[in-house]
């Protein structure tokens, strides 16, 4: 009987690379995505086409309201998504695109799903470039959540260890794209943009777009998605 894995899938290149990695193993895959604001609704649409390329047992989209977490450009319509010209301009601290407790909320849902379906493995696509800007992407956070998961669940208390896997955690964005290209990831079906147009074009200037474009450039590969 195959082991089951829950994968947090955003529709971006990082989580898609994780999906590719896990798809080459013997896991039965349960993908979990979140629709939490109009600015990420395009991600959810992209995922519908993306997962057709993979043997995903089940894909769940969870609708949650994070708009009460004001102060983030990704959940508050009154805050503009900051734009940049190059990587030198990117913030070195926690940016306004940080969403309070986002990964904690997402991983908590994943943990609940894992218990229900009998999975003991949860995968998330955090990486080294996230550390500076997003504290809930750091290795110590992932380890702490895993420890909590094993203290606060029936399966954990019964001695069946739950593992939070972050296979990209020691990789840069450049290395992730390189790895994905080697594995055959179709990045044309992914999106990174924090502020896409209504017709699905990426802005090319938000933190996420700049980081993505830089990663493809360093791999001497043209980013296959369309920009404004």
From Swiss-Prot:
It catalyses: 7-carboxy-7-deazaguanine + NH4(+) + ATP = 7-cyano-7-deazaguanine + ADP + phosphate + H2O + H(+). ATP binds at residues 9-19. Binds 1 zinc ion per subunit. Its cofactor is Zn(2+). The keyword ATP-binding applies. Pathway: Purine metabolism; 7-cyano-7-deazaguanine biosynthesis. Zn(2+) binds at residues 193, 203, 206, 209. GO terms for molecular function: ATP binding; ligase activity, forming carbon-nitrogen bonds; zinc ion binding. Its EC number is 6.3.4.20. Catalyzes the ATP-dependent conversion of 7-carboxy-7-deazaguanine (CDG) to 7-cyano-7-deazaguanine (preQ(0)). Belongs to the QueC family. This is 7-cyano-7-deazaguanine synthase. It comes from Rickettsia conorii (strain ATCC VR-613 / Malish 7).
């Amino acid at each position: 009987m195959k082991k089951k894995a829950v994968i947090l899938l955003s529709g971006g290149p990082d989580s898609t690379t994780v999906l590719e990695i896990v798809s080459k193993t013997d896991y039965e895959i349960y993908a979990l995505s979140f629709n939490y604001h109009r600015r990420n609704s395009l991600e959810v649409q992209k995922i519908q086409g993306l997962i057709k390329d993979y043997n995903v047992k089940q894909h769940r989209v969870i609708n949650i309201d994070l708009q009460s977490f004001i102060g983030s450009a990704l959940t508050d319509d009154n805050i503009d998504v900051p734009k940049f010209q190059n990587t030198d301009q990117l913030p070195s601290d926690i940016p306004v695109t940080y969403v309070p407790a986002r990964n904690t909320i997402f991983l908590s849902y994943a943990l609940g799903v894992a218990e229900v379906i009998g999975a003991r493995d949860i995968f998330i696509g955090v990486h080294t470039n996230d550390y500076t800007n997003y504290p809930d992407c750091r290795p110590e956070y992932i380890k702490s959540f895993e420890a909590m998961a094993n203290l606060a669940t029936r399966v954990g208390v019964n001695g069946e260890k739950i593992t939070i896997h972050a296979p990209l955690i020691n990789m840069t964005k450049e290395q992730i794209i390189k790895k994905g290209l080697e594995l055959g990831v179709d990045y044309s079906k992914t999106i990174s943009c924090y502020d896409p147009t209504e017709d699905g074009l990426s802005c090319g200037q938000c933190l996420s777009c700049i980081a993505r474009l830089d990663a493809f450039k360093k791999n001497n590969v043209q980013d296959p998605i369309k920009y404004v």
